[in-house]
Structures are given as C-alpha cells and as structure tokens.
UniProtKB/Swiss-Prot annotation:
One of its GO terms (cellular component) is protein-DNA complex. TPR repeats lie at residues 372-405. Keywords: Activator, DNA-binding, Phosphoprotein, TPR repeat, Transcription, Transcription regulation, Two-component regulatory system, Virulence. SMART domains: Trans_reg_C. Disruption phenotype: Abnormal expression of genes encoding virulence proteins. Does not affect the production of reactive oxygen species (ROS) in infected pigs. Coiled coil: none annotated. This is Transcriptional regulator HilA. SUPFAM superfamilies: C-terminal effector domain of the bipartite response regulators, TPR-like. GO terms for molecular function: phosphorelay response regulator activity; transcription cis-regulatory region binding. The main transcriptional regulator of the Salmonella pathogenicity island 1 (SPI1) gene expression. Activates the expression of invasion genes by a direct action at their promoters and also indirectly by increasing the level of InvF. Also binds upstream of prgH and directly activates the expression of prgHIJK operon. Pfam families: Trans_reg_C (PF00486).
Length: 553
C-alpha cells in the first residue's frame, strides 16, 4: 500500500467554519497559521476528501502509515491530537467516531479548486430520434442537445439543433458528416411499449462509420427528458476515449469569495427561520451567479425554495417551479449527484409522480446510502404522503447523522403531533429546545400552539414573548393566531379574519384550513377541503392529517 503524500502539488483548498486547509500542508484559522503535524494533516485530508462518508480505521492506517508497523492506538492518538488542533468541543464536533466502523468528518466542507485545463474536444452530432409524433421528436431532440451541451467545459462539443434538426434520411446523414466532419454521432428510435417507450440508441464513430455501442433504454411515462440525457451521457463516457468529466470537480466552487458566500448561505438555510431563509435565498442566488458550474449552490437553492414554500413565505407554485429548475440544473452538471437526485425525487413525489420519484430516490440512496440530505428529503416525502410511521423512522435516521438539522427536527415535531398526539409533541418540543433549537421561532410557535391546545395559557403566553416580531409571518403567524383563538376564543376571531383577508391566494393554501375552520365555520372550511381534495392539491396531503381538522375528514 503506497504512503500518503502529505504535500501534493495542487491549488485545491478545503474550507470549513473559519478554517482553510491548503494542499501544501498548511492550516489557517481566521487567516492565522495553525501548526498541524504531517500525520494529523494526512488524516484530516482523507476525512475531508470523503465528504461526510465514513472512513474505516484500516483505510486510514493503510493510507497514512503505509507498511509501517502500527496499531489502532496510533490512529486514536492522532485523532485526539487532531481534535485539539481544531479546538473541538461538545458543541462543535468536527470528527465523529462510529464505533466498529471508523471516523467521519461531521461539518459542512466546501472544496475550492481553480478551473482545470481544457481537455481535448470531441465533436458530437445528435440526430433527431425516429418517433411517430414529429412534434415530440423535435422537442426531445432539442432537450437532449441542450442537456449534453452542458458538458462543453469537459471536452464535448455538440452541434446545434439548427444544423441537425432536418437530418433524417441516410442521404442527409452522409452529407452532414461529409461537410462538418464531427467525431461521433448519436441516432435513436423510439418504439411504444404499452404506456412506456423503448428508445434504441446507437453511438457511431464517423471515421469508418464504426458502430461503438447499441443499447435499448426503457422510458417510463412522464419521465423527464433529463433522465434520458443522463443515461446517454453515461454511455458517451464509456464509448469515447479521452472524454472525462470529473463529477467531483464540478461540485467544487472556484474561488474563496464564492465559497464564503456559499457557506454563509448554507448557514442561513440551516437556521430554518423565515428571516434566515430569505437571507439564504439572496446569498445562494449570488453564489450561483459567481460559480455557475458548481453543483452545491443549485442544490441548496432548490432546498431553500421548497423550505420557504413549506413555511408559507413564498408562493408555493412558483417555489416548486424554481426548485425544480435548480435541481435539474444540478443534475445537468452531474447526473449522478445524490443530493440533486434526492431533491428531484421529492419534487416529483410532491407532484404525485410517484414512479419517477421512487426511481430517483432509489438511485440517490444507492449512490449515497449514508446521507443526512437524502434521509431528510425522503422523510419529508413520506410525511407529505401521510406515511407517518415510516416518515418518523427516516427523519430519526437523518437526525442521527446530523442532530443539528433544524428542518428535520421541526418535521419530526409535526409528525409526532400528527401520529402520536399532543402530549408527545410537547415533550419532544421541550427536548428539541434543550438541544439545538432553543431559539428557533418555528419550534417556539408550535410549542405555543400545543400548550394553548392543552389549556396551558400562561406558559404559552410566556413562550410567545421569546419570538422576534420580524419572524412572525407565514406558518409562525398561523400557529400564533390559532394559539390566540385557544386562549381567547371568540375575542380572537376578528384578528384571525383580518389576517385571512390579507392573505393572497388563500384558495391555494391548505395550511390556512385550521384558521378558516374556527373563523368562518365548518361549511366554508369543508368547501375549501373538498376543493383541495378534488384538485389533488400537492400541499393538501400534508395538512389533511392535522388533528385540528378531524371534523372535515
């Protein structure tokens, strides 16, 4: 086993919290150099390279100590020293020990890497697929060309649609190849197979017209074109020598400035409050503009839009459109990015596209079976679908991997209220407040509502005072108004009605049903309930489980 080289020649940097680890062996904290011995440096690099995955003790011993005669005690001492170098304490754990498995770096890490030299270019012509529906053929042709054009920085040059769109006969193909001389071309034929389709793909090297690969791909009904594009991209990697897009590289940010903006945006996203999500939206949008070829900001931005919709502070329909756009962009940069696939899985299942969503979640989990992100998205998906027991189990798995994830803790609190009742919810809320969510206004507003439902009005009023007025919007406002109704009954109704009148698109927000029921009565609430049910409203599935709406079921 070769020795780990502690000073590789690279301009890559790892950034976490206020640390910067350079690949020249130096560690900086707030721009001041921190002494780190070679062995500790080597272990830290391996943990950071693993990007949150578990690294076994044997792997660390083999790569850092090589063939030297050492035992696990040497590694234990090294980890202990590394924790001291990083000033680790109980509140800020950087390195997690998983007994019997190994170690894992437990904090957000961003890799900064300057752009790599441009690779050799391979020109590709994508011919229109033979299909019964001409309009559908043109649409699919455009989508595939657009999708594969994203790989231009990695050596793939795709001829534009305007040149290839009329290339359908053998004569047209031969003329195009003779005039423009691309290196390769792709042709395809779509054959109906029940409700689905079989796409027969051929990849041909133009020199000698040599067939490199032939494959049949099954397309499920309503499956997005980006998934077919991803499969074709994988085939190109296998068939074209020298064509390599490093998916790890395109997930990295290209400057310290963009890294710092991303980390600030990610921090605000993780705080999971109305104000912090609005700040995250600004920062992550800025980061996408600074690093348009990096995956992480697109994924974070997609999650931000979904979170704002869930919290009732962004128009739900527009949020879903924006989230899907950014998740698709991330998959165009790396078709095997687990977080992006998980986000698309969540978005598709929210839209009742269960088969596609299930396939995406399955692929994401296979690529990254121990991911707090994937566990959270899947648990959120199960919660929205009403599978409360399975949702609770999955969210618990997420919190085991990342106990500080505010959004997962709050999702668990809603699930507990729906599944096992208000007493368990109050106990869990107190537990979460004593751990990582003591000041979170969403959690506080939920506790105020739960306590008010139980008749503990004085305690609820005391807790209300801890919520900042700038955070009282969306779901927080709804929770506090419902608590006010529990405390003051009829006297609270004018305020609730005024709030409902001020809300835009009330007919598209099932989260307002508890207030509508108490303010306007069962008949109007039932009318809204049936409207959401008949429209198959994507957010109704989540709210119809609320115990406060039991009269309407």
């Amino acid at each position: 086993m070769p020795h780990f080289n502690p000073v590789p020649v690279s301009n890559k940097k790892f950034v976490f919290d206020d640390f910067i680890l350079n690949m020249d062996g130096s560690l900086l904290r707030s721009e001041k150099k921190v002494n780190i011995p070679p062995k500790e440096y080597a272990v830290l690099v391996i943990l950071l390279e693993a990007a949150g995955e578990i690294v076994s003790k044997n792997t660390l011993l083999d790569q850092v100590w090589g063939d030297a005669e050492v035992n696990e005690e040497s590694l234990t001492r090294c980890i202990y020293a590394l924790r001291r170098i990083l000033s680790e304490d109980k509140e800020h754990r950087y390195i997690e020990t998983l007994y019997g498995q190994g170690y894992r770096f437990n904090r957000p890490v961003v890799v900064v890497s300057p752009p790599a030299p441009q690779p050799t270019t391979h020109t590709l012509a994508i011919l229109p697929f033979q299909m019964q529906d001409q309009v559908q053929s043109e649409s699919l042709h455009y989508s595939i060309v657009k999708g594969l054009s994203q790989y231009a920085p990695f050596g793939l040059s795709v001829l534009p649609v305007t040149i290839t769109k009329n290339c359908r006969s053998v004569k047209d193909i031969l003329e195009l190849m003779d005039q423009l001389r691309p290196d390769y071309y792709i042709s395809g034929q779509m054959i109906p197979d029940g409700n689905d389709n079989i796409v027969q793909i051929e990849i041909v090297r133009v020199k000698g017209y040599h067939l490199l690969h032939q494959e049949s791909i099954k397309l499920i009904e309503h499956q997005p074109a980006s998934l077919l594009q991803n499969k074709i991209a994988n085939l190109l990697l296998r068939c074209i020598p020298g064509l390599r897009w490093d998916t790890k590289q395109i997930s990295e940010l290209n400057s310290i400035d963009s890294t710092m903006v991303y980390l600030r945006g990610k921090h605000e996203l993780n705080q999971y409050t109305p104000y912090s999500l609005q700040q995250a939206l600004k920062l992550l949008t800025q980061c996408v503009n600074m690093s348009p070829n990096s995956i992480a900001p697109y994924c974070a931005l997609a999650e931000c839009y979904l979170s704002m919709a869930q919290m009732g502070i962004f128009d739900k329909q527009n949020a879903m459109i924006k989230a899907k756009e950014h998740a698709i962009k991330a998959t165009e940069l790396d078709h095997n990015n687990p977080q992006a696939l998980g986000l698309l899985g969540l978005i598709n299942t929210i839209h009742s596209e269960y088969i596609v969503g299930s396939l995406l979640f399955k692929q994401a989990n296979l690529l990254s079976p121990i991911s707090a992100d994937i566990k959270y998205y899947y648990g959120w998906n199960l919660f929205m679908a009403g599978q409360l027991e399975e949702a609770l189990q999955t969210i618990n798995e997420c919190l085991k991997l990342d106990p500080t994830r505010a959004a997962a803790g709050i999702t668990k609190l809603w699930i507990t209220y729906y599944h096992t009742g208000i007493d368990d919810a109050i106990r869990l809320g107190d537990e979460l407040r004593s751990q990582h969510l003591q000041d979170n206004p969403i959690l506080l507003s939920m506790q105020v509502m739960f306590l008010s439902l139980k008749g503990k009005h004085e305690l609820a009023r005391k807790l209300t005072k801890e919520i900042s007025t700038q955070e009282i919007t969306g779901l927080i406002a709804v929770n506090l108004l419902y608590a006010e109704y529990c405390q003051n009954s009829e006297r609270a109704l004018p305020t609730i009605r005024e709030f409902l009148e001020s809300e835009q698109r009330i007919d598209n927000n099932p989260g307002l049903l508890p207030l509508v029921l108490v303010a306007h009565g069962e008949a109007i609430a039932e009318k809204m309930w049936n409207k959401f049910k008949n429209e198959d409203n994507i957010w109704f599935k989540r709210w119809k489980q609320d115990p406060r709406l039991i009269k309407l079921r």
